[in-house]
Design a protein with these regions (language model features):
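Polybasic/polar functional segments that serve as interface/processing modules
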Residues: 1-115
């Protein structure tokens, strides 16, 4: 994951999105549906209908960046809400991108000694 500047907000667009959209389509969706400015420096995350593909739109100060990730197995954990946005922390975004349930992360125990 590319390091985000301190103070960058991460917004998940709830529901599903037609991910055939590119820079222009997703920017328009941020403005009309989410009522946000796509050039604000915040990260906007969208999920496709099947749940195995997400796209992230981010203005880095020089231009718009569009990132995509498809899971080979499983689906991305997504909020149950059908409209609006959900805010994530950078740690939650990292878990989302790894396919981990970011809503209830579970720490695995590492053995201290192999006796």
């Amino acid at each position: 994951m590319i390091g985000l500047p301190t103070g960058t907000s991460i917004w998940i667009a709830t529901g599903f999105t037609d991910l055939r959209r590119g820079f222009t389509g997703l920017s328009g969706m941020v403005q009309t549906t989410l009522q946000e400015n796509p050039f604000s420096g915040h990260v906007f995350v969208f999920r496709g209908r099947r749940g195995d593909l997400i796209k992230m739109l981010w203005w880095d100060g020089d231009g718009l960046c569009l990132f995509a990730k498809r899971l080979e197995r499983g689906r991305f954990i997504w909020p149950q809400a059908t409209s609006g946005t959900v805010s994530l922390t950078p740690a939650q975004l990292s878990m989302l991108l790894e396919g981990i349930d970011w809503r209830r992360p579970v720490r695995t125990q590492t053995p201290q000694l192999a006796v």
